[in-house]
Amino acid sequence: MFAQYSNRREFLKSGGLSLILLLNSCSNVSKKVNFALQNSFLPDSFKDIIPFAWKQNKINFGSNNLEKNRNIILDSDFTLINDGWISTINFSQFNEINESYFSEILDRRSKDFLNSFEVNQRNKLFPIGLVPYAIIIKNNKDLVSSARKSWNFLLSRKLTKKIIFPESPRVLISIAEKINSSDALAKLKSQAMLFDDQNILNWLINSEACVAIVPYSLCSKYLKIDPRLSIVFPKQGVPLIWYFVLSRSNLSSEILIDWIKSLESKSTVDKLSSEGWYIPFNTNYIQSKYKAEMHHNLGPSKLCWDNSWSFPQLTNAQKIKFENYWNNLLIP
């Protein structure tokens, strides 16, 4: 054994180097992965597929404590964020993750949406989830048929002051553009009972409200326990919410790839889609989830998906314009 070494000192030196490499390797494997996310808006099925060994660092993009969010993100290997909050992210702090595996697995819809971002941004964003908005109707089966056809039903006199809208100017304006009526946005405002994102379904269940527009991923548990509620996806399409993973990690990219691969299993795809979370990957089974027949009660139909829309990033000037427009809209 000693023959390949010229002396005892060289042997010990070589052995010490091997030990250091072994310890470094073990350290990299055992290092806990830190994952920053706002889990209050995630379905249980998604929370369940996050590896148990990963430490979940909770953030709140809706809070005023942005500095705390930044510190948590800087201390995390990966961050989950939706497209509504991407403007709060400093992309220079993240790594590119556009490896061949990631570019090959994405479907056409996700690639098209990524192309709406600047190059330095799109190369650091990996789409991992797509959530459609849904219409939830309470105690009014007659509305379901008209709601399936178009968004025009929102202007019904029966719904005056009985609709709960998301607190998002872009969502509301985009819906108004689908309604066949002059001054549709002002008319929608007159139909609103309130605007809310946090407790929208609690308001619907426990008030005189009849309709709520809410991300599908927040609906499933309420639909199971309250028979008064019906879910509808208009064939005109619905607004879409995108979720992305960003990486700051010095760990092997295989850690992220292995987790991404786990999302492709049929059982995982079934669980996620049943709770309103769709994987934007280009596999036959995943794509079948986007091809449901019309009047399918477990998600949007193919026609609805084809007509649905995403929101490209706003410039600072556009953002200020939307904020001012929204604030003026809320003034009685």
Annotated model-derived regions:
Residues E254, S262-P332:
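Extracellular/periplasmic juxtamembrane helices and adjacent flexible linkers that interface
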Residues S27-F91:
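Early extracytoplasmic/lumenal segment of secretory-pathway proteins
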Residues L143-L159:
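Flexible hinge/capping segments at coil-to-helix
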Residues I97-R108, L125, P227-P239, R248-N250:
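Short beta-strand->loop
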Residues D83-I89, I164-Q236:
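Ligand-binding pocket segment of bilobal, Venus flytrap-like solute-binding proteins
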Residues A134-D142, L240-L256, S262-L263, K271-L272, ...:
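A bilobed periplasmic-binding-protein/Venus flytrap-type ligand-binding module shared by bacterial periplasmic
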